[in-house]
Design a protein with these regions (language model features):
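N-terminal glutamine amidotransferase
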Residues: 1-74
Length: 74
């Protein structure tokens, strides 16, 4: 089953999104992705495997955004 988490607010979105999708991790999935808006551009990051793999792909990117969406895919 897929999980989707979105955030719009004053705080930085990345950590809120990642922590939110981790709470849905038990649902089972094979990949994940995150999209945020930075500098008026959509930035997308994707990874195969667990959320920890997406965290590696994200690294230091997507740190300034205050709006985004993250998902897992079955």
């Amino acid at each position: 089953m897929c999980g989707i988490v979105g955030y719009i607010g004053k705080n930085k979105a990345k950590s809120i999104l990642v922590e939110g999708i981790k709470k849905l991790e038990y649902r089972g999935y094979d990949s994940s992705g995150m999209a945020v808006i930075e500098d008026n551009k959509i930035v997308c990051k994707k990874a195969v495997g667990r959320i920890s793999e997406l965290e590696k792909v994200l690294g230091g990117s997507c740190d300034r955004s205050h709006i985004g969406i993250i998902h897992t895919r079955w």
